[in-house]
Regions:
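Transmembrane helix-loop-helix hairpins at membrane boundaries of multipass inner-membrane proteins
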Residues: 1-7, 21-122, 198-211, 540, ...
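Membrane-interfacial helical/loop segments at transmembrane boundaries in membrane proteins
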Residues: 67-76, 200-212, 412, 416-421, ...
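Hydrophobic transmembrane alpha-helices and their helix-loop junctions in integral membrane proteins
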Residues: 104-112, 129-141, 155-449
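Alpha-helical transmembrane segments and their helix-start/interface "positive-inside/aromatic belt" motifs
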Residues: 33-46, 168-180, 380-385, 479-487
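C-terminal TM-helix exit segments that contain a strictly Trp-centered aromatic cap at the helix terminus
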Residues: 49-60, 185-193, 397, 495, ...
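Membrane-interface helix-loop-helix modules in multi-pass inner-membrane proteins
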Residues: 66-95, 140-143, 147-155, 232, ...
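Central hydrophobic cores of alpha-helical transmembrane segments in multi-pass inner-membrane proteins
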Residues: 9-27, 42-55, 95-109, 127-129, ...
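Cytoplasmic/organellar membrane-interface segments at the starts of transmembrane helices
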Residues: 378-382, 444-540, 544-549, 555-570
Length: 570
């Protein structure tokens, strides 16, 4: 085992060590000690990020479909469960997103958490480790454990350090997540049992569960896919199982809101597991899911128009963009699948950045009501600039990552089903999705015009009373806040102007998943066609030409044989 193979488990272990160490340090009454805990947590979060830079230099981008930097250590060998880690191009870029944003979220929290600071930073680091574990896991059971353990720190961060309605938000979040977890675990265990029955070993290895899922009949695939779908759709979230997210984002402290909006675990689970494992069911459910995606896009955009709470505005914007993400995934074109991953990256970056900007505004104005904030560019020009920058990124301004991700996703959906592209959607889904994105851009422009460039508001609500007062001194960005926002802005700009490294590295990994899905669908169609042809031939050879000849004379014999495959392809 070479040293390079240890980089992924080290990324996972270092935040956990930091969490254990910080948890044992009592914050005390001194503000300096609390600040020191935040800085220490930031350092433990920064180390894996620096290791991520090393990983970027060692990754073979031409072989993006190959799991690289593999680490494998037996855990439960009798069940073929291992500590198996690795990254391909898809998981690499989502891992980089996590490694960039989480340290910034922790740094943003320094001096802002007023009680039980050691516990807060410990939970943030545990959440960080869980997200890293999700994206580097090559064993499906290991993925599931990290996927579900990520709920625990989010629950405590929301329930302890959230706002006035935090307990309701935490309970609702937990109930939704727990319901999805049960279905998800049952589906994965069933696939492992199928692999034991058909291939002789009980295994949670990724390749083995792919093989087990694809060996199921279309009906069996549909039942298992439904369990995976509900589990992952709750975490996306997708309409109509989205209602936990706006409340959770609104009631969480800013770092907790960032972690909720950042992670794209549900979308990643659908892309990595549900669709390639159960391709026949995925194709069968595609029209239904695509309609839900379009509803998510339009619903999120329309609800955002009437929002006055800054955090709720961002939450419904995230819902709209994730609807586009899953729609592009369902298109099953190379362009659409690439757009799906790009939307995960852009939504994570932009939503996290906007939430941090909104948190900085809240700390100065003590309100989240957008109608009570205006003229930000005059009083806080630097913060106003970053607010405009990230708002415009979300509105898909050309040159920023939001634009390239939305365009690629919409084009991939539009050409889906046309000659030479494959897929099962088309303009009927792409056009309303595009209208939803335009709607989103319009409400972002509206709030930029009002909040940033509107008339200067001199009175703001007091944090503790119902009266209003003119804030004595409203300072622009501090050095720490510059350090939080600048890396995110540079990433949004760089990926918008030069997305080629991401796009090129994704092609092999995306192509591999797409090939597995379409090959399984084609194989099923071919086998069903052969069965139907055999049945027609058997009827003819049995001396009953009257049942066949009229069909052949009308040119319909082939259509009867191909009826199921044609319906499936559509």
């Amino acid at each position: 085992m070479t040293q390079s193979h240890l980089i992924l488990p080290m990324m996972l272990v270092i935040p956990l060590i930091g969490a254990a160490l910080i948890f044992m340090i009592k914050p005390g009454a001194s503000g300096h000690r609390a600040r020191g805990l935040g800085v220490l947590a930031f350092c433990f979060a920064l180390i894996p990020a620096l290791m991520g830079v090393v990983l970027l230099t060692r990754f073979n981008y031409a072989a993006g479909s190959v799991w690289q930097q593999r680490f494998n250590y037996p855990w439960l060998p009798q069940f073929h469960v291992n500590f198996s880690f690795g990254v391909d191009a898809i998981s690499l870029w989502l891992l980089m997103l996590t490694l960039l944003v989480t340290p910034m979220a922790i740094l943003d929290a320094v001096n802002k958490i007023q009680h039980r600071q050691n516990e807060f930073y410990a939970w943030m680091l545990i959440s960080y480790a869980c997200m890293i574990g999700v994206f580097i896991s090559h064993d499906v059971l290991l993925f599931y454990l990290f996927f579900e353990f990520s709920l625990i720190p989010t629950f405590f961060i929301l329930g302890i350090w959230g706002h006035s309605d935090r307990r309701k938000a935490a309970v609702k979040f937990f109930l939704y997540a727990f319901a999805g977890s049960v279905l998800l675990l049952a589906s994965l265990i069933y696939l492992a049992l199928v692999h034991q029955e058909k291939f002789g070993t009980f295994s949670f290895a990724l390749a083995d569960l792919y093989r087990a899922g694809q060996a199921l009949s279309p009906t069996q695939q549909g039942i298992v896919f439904l369990g995976l779908l509900i589990g992952f759709a709750i975490k996306v979230p997708l309409f109509p199982v989205h209602t936990w997210m706006p409340l959770a984002i609104t009631e969480s402290p800013t770092p907790g809101s960032v972690m909720i909006a950042l992670v794209k675990l549900g979308a990643y689970g659908l892309l990595r597991f549900a669709i390639p494992m159960l391709p026949l069911a995925a194709v069968r459910f595609t029209p239904f899911l695509a309609v839900l995606c379009v509803i998510s896009i339009l619903y999120g955009g329309l609800i955002s128009w009437v929002q006055r709470d800054m955090k709720k505005l961002i939450a419904y914007s995230v819902l709209s963009h994730l609807g586009l993400c899953i729609l592009a995934l369902l298109a099953l074109t190379m362009t659409g699948l690439t757009g799906c991953v790009l939307v995960m990256l852009s939504s994570g970056l932009l939503a996290a950045a906007m939430l941090m900007v909104m948190g900085m505004i809240y700390r100065r104005y003590h309100t989240r009501n957008l109608l009570e904030i205006s003229g930000l560019a005059r009083r806080l020009p630097v913060l106003g600039f970053f607010a405009v920058f990230f708002f415009m990124g979300t509105a898909a301004l050309p040159g920023l990552i939001g634009f390239i991700s939305e365009i690629i996703s919409l084009v991939g959906t539009y050409v889906s089903g046309s000659a030479g592209h494959g897929g099962y959607l088309g303009p009927a889904y792409a056009i309303p999705a595009a209208l939803g994105m335009i709607l989103g851009a319009l409400y972002m422009l509206y709030w930029v015009a009002h909040v940033i460039f509107g008339p200067l508001v001199e009175t703001v609500p007091d944090a503790d009373t119902s009266s209003t007062h003119a804030p004595a001194v409203v300072q622009d960005l501090s050095v720490r806040e510059w350090l939080v926002l600048l890396p995110l802005a540079l990433a949004v700009l760089f990926l918008g102007l030069y997305p080629a490294p991401v796009l090129n590295s994704l092609q092999p990994a995306i192509g591999k998943i797409r090939h597995e899905v379409l090959a399984a669908v084609q194989e099923n169609a071919t086998s069903r066609m052969a069965v139907n042809t055999h049945r027609v031939g058997a009827v003819h050879s049995a001396g009953k030409p009257g049942l066949v000849a009229p069909l052949e004379s009308q040119g319909l014999g082939k259509a009867v044989a191909l009826r199921l495959p044609v319906r499936l392809a559509r």
